[in-house]
Structure formats: C-alpha cells, structure tokens
Amino acid sequence: MFKNILIVGCGLIGSSILRASIKKKISKKIYVLEKSKIHIKQIKKLRLNCEILKDPKKQITNVDMIIICTHLSEYLKIFKKIEKYINKNTIVTDVGSAKEKVSGEIKTKIKRNISWISSHPIAGSEVSGPEFGNEKLFSGKWCVLIKDKNVNKKHLKILTKFWTKIGSNIVYMSLKEHDHIFSITSHIPHLVAYNMVKTAMNFEKNKKSNIVKFSAGGLRDFTRTAASNEIMWK
C-alpha cells in the first residue's frame, strides 16, 4: 500500500499503529521518530520491524504518509523537524483528540501547501508506552477523519483505506462537529474523573482514612479514567 511511512511518537497509539501496519503489511518500510530514550529502548527490546530515527536530520526520500502520535502542544515543533520529508504526495495526519485549534495553527503557521488530513482513532487505554501497544487496538473501533472543503480527495481515500485495513470503522466529520462531540463524550468525563480522584485522595490524606481502599465500582471506574496519560491533552 505504501513504500515509506513515518510514525512520529511511539507510545501506546504509535506503537499500536506500528504493530498493526507490520501485521497487515501496510508499508515496505516504516520509520519511527522518537525522542524518549526509554521508549527507544523498549521498541528495540520488542524487536519491532522498523527503523528508529534518533536524528531527525537524517534524510528520508519518498515518504508516503506521516502520522503524528504525540501530544498536541508538540505539533508545530514536529512540523519543523519533519518538513523536509514532506512532498506533494505525502499525506500528513495525526491521532489527536482536539482538532480545530491545532488544525488552525498548522494552516496559518506552516507556509507550505501540505496535504493535512486529521484523524482521531477512538481507541486507547489508561496505560501508556510502546510495550502496551496492540495490533488489534483499532479493530472494530471508530476512527474520525476530518473532511473539509479543501481536502485532497485522493489522499482522503488512501487514508480511509489505511485506517480500514488496520481494523477501524470510518466516520467523516468537520472540525467543529468533532470537537463538539468529543468535548462532551471524552474531555469532560476525563476532567470529572481527574477531579473526583484528586478529591478522594486529598480527603484521605487530610482525614488519615483509607477511603480509596474501600472504593466500590463507581470510584474504580473514575480511577481507571484518571490514570490515562494527561500529557496527551496538552
């Protein structure tokens, strides 16, 4: 399907995309750009069939698709590092859970005409890191693709095929529709969970009482949600 794919950031989602792409033989060559020494060590230990780029200055030619799997605040920095890999045929996508602000910044601050089509696979876990990656993470799960009036239709079709091939069910949304839906179904529940667990822990500390120890199913569900990596929201 592809000759070269570059995955930027290889945590839970990035490593799951990597594993699924290897399993489905999506690309002849898969590159991973990762700055975490711990993650690099884990990827090597897992013996995943990819080339790790420790140095973003290394030249790669004919990159068909770049998938950004980092937290949102890193996007503009990443674009400066990967810009040399992008040509007119390169699809650039991401897996972030907030779209309108980030996409707006990319369009206004990145001067080059790039084929940017944002993705949001509705899959994940409270755990993080490449060792928790799962080639079946996206199987039967929704993946939202942002479809605006300027989208490259050929690239959208290719990106749809990619996500479908690794198991996702595709739905198309506008930036506004996406952010409206997931602010209610995902962001607010996480915010409530973080505050609920923090309140319980503070109360336990102040009262010197084992509150969390005796939590029933309700609070346990909150703790699972609150355990997810908060840096991905920044």
Where in this protein do the model-derived segments appear?
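NAD(P)+-binding Rossmann beta1-loop-alpha1 motif at the extreme N-terminus of oxidoreductases
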Residues: 1-58
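Residues at the starts of beta-strands that form the adenosine-phosphate
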Residues: 4, 28-29, 115, 142, ...
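Hydrophobic/aromatic beta-strand patches that form the interior of the parallel beta-sheet core
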Residues: 31-33, 53, 93, 117, ...
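Short beta->alpha hinge that forms the Motif I/post-I loop of the SAM-binding pocket
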Residues: 35-36, 70-71, 95
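Rossmann-like NAD(P)-binding element
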Residues: 58-86, 90-91
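Rossmann-like NAD(P)(H) cofactor-binding subdomain of soluble oxidoreductases
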Residues: 78-131
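Internal alpha-helical scaffold of NAD(P)-dependent oxidoreductase catalytic cores
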Residues: 135-228
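C-terminal active-site/capping subdomain that shapes the small-molecule cofactor and substrate pocket
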Residues: 234
